[in-house]
Amino acid sequence: MTKHKFSPSILRAYDIRGIYNQTLFDADAFFVGKSFASFLHKNGKKKISVACDGRSSSPLLKAQLIKALVESGLEVLDVGLGPTPMLYFSVYHLDCDAGIMVTGSHNPKDHNGFKMMLRDRPFFGDDILGLGKLVEAEDFVDGEGSIEDVDVKSDYVDRMLSDCVLGQSESHLLDDIDAMKPKKKMKIAWDAGNGAAGEIMTDLSKRIDADHILLFADIDANFPNHHPDPTVPKNLEDLIKVVLDEGCDLGIAFDGDGDRIGVVDNEGAIIWGDQLMVFYAREILKAKPGATIIADVKASNVLFDEIAKAGGVPLMGKTGHSLIKAKMKETKAVLAGEMSGHIFFADKYYGFDDGIYAAIRIINIVEQSSFSLADMRKELPQTCATPEIRIECSEERKFQIVEELKENLKKSGVSFNDIDGVRTNTGKGWWLLRASNTQSVLVARCEADSVENLEKLKVDLRKNLEFCAVKIPEELQ
C-alpha cells in the first residue's frame, strides 16, 4: 500500500482546508481521521463528535473521516449537518473528548476542510502539523470502535434560548413567561446565506417572541443568493434592504458555517466586528469590572480605549480563532473578538466562537437599551477607517512580503507592532498589513482621526506595498 501524503498547502495554522478533488481528497479525510485518532489514543482520549456543513463534498468527506475514526477504536457520535458552533457545543453537551467539523467555512463552494477541537484546549499549529507527521510515519492505531447518530439541534437551540432575555413564542411558553415579556416586540431580520446555520436560525426564530424575517435559510451548497461571508458589504445588501423596507430593529447574518456574525443596525449601517465588541464589552464589564477582553490586531483603537474606559483590561492578540481561544485560556479573558465577526464568550458560555450565540447577546443588548442600535453606533467615538482590505497573493509570497516590509520599516527607522504582521501607529492613526492564515491573501486596514490623516496613511501603505511589488487594491487607490 502506497504511503499517504497530504498536499502541503492543506495543513493550515488553524485547520485543514483545500480545494475538493484538487488539493483535498476523500483519502485525506480518511487519514485525517486515522492520525487524529492516534493523537487521541496517545492522550488517553476516545470519545469524539463529528458534524458537517452543507457543501456537496461534506457528506463524502465525513463518511471517510468516520470510517477511519471507528476503525481506530474510537466512540464516534455523528451529530449530523449543522453549524460549527453546534459541533463545538456537542463536545461539551455529550461529554466528548474532542470534535471534528467538516466545513469549508466562508471559502468558495469548491473548498472544504476540517476544524478540530479538544474539550480542554484548542487544536492548531504544531498539533495540525503533527497529524502530517503521524501519517508520514504511518503511526496508526487499529481497533473496533462504534458509531451513533445523535441529534443535538433542539438542545443547542434550548441553550441559546436560556440566555435570551426575550420571551419564547406562545408555542413554547414557560410557566413564568409573563414576567419575561418585553416592553415592545422586536423585529429582526436574519440571513443565513444558504449556509449551515439555516436550520438552527429557523428553529430559533420560531421560539423567540419577536417578529422575524428570514432570508436564505435553505441550506444550498451553491450559495445561489450571495456568498456567506458577512465581512464583505455586498453580501449584506439583501439584509440591509429588508431591514430598511420592513423597519427592523436589526439584521443578523452568518457566515457559511455559523461561527461568525454580521450585524446591520436599524438604519441599514453595518456594525463592524470591533464596534460590536464595544457593546458586548460594556455589558459584561458592568458585572465583571477589571476583566480581560481580547481583540485582534485588526481592531480599532476605539475598541481598546472603550474597554479601558468601561473598567476592563484590553489586550491585543493575533488574528485566528484557535490563537484567540488559546490566549483566552491563558489570560482567563471573559470575551474576545475579531474584526471578521468571530466572537468568543467565556461569560455565561463556553469560550468558543459562536455567531448564533453572539446574535442572542446583541439582541439582548438592543432589547434592554432605551436607544436604538443606530443610536448606540453613533454614540461611539468617530474615526475614519477603511474596512478590511484583502489583496490576492500566493501562499508562498504572502509571508515573504510581510518579512520584506518589516525589514524596510526597520531600515527606515519606523517603529511598529509585529504581534501579527505589521501595525504602525503614528499617533494620528495606524495601518496594518498581515498575511491571512486561511486564504491566499494579504489583509490591510487603515484608521485615522480625520479624513486627511486617513489619506496620508493610505499613501504611506501604498508606498510600502509598491516597495514589495504588490498590486495596489482599488480601496487604496
Question: What do these predicted regions represent?
Answer:
Residues 129-162, 174, 181, 266-339, ...:
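Proline/glycine-rich low-complexity loops and linkers
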Residues 110-133, 264-279, 349-360, 366:
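A short, gly/pro- and small-residue-rich
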Residues 1-67, 71-72, 146-185:
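An N-terminal, well-structured beta->alpha segment
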Residues 250, 288-477:
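Phosphate-binding and adjacent anionic-ligand microenvironments
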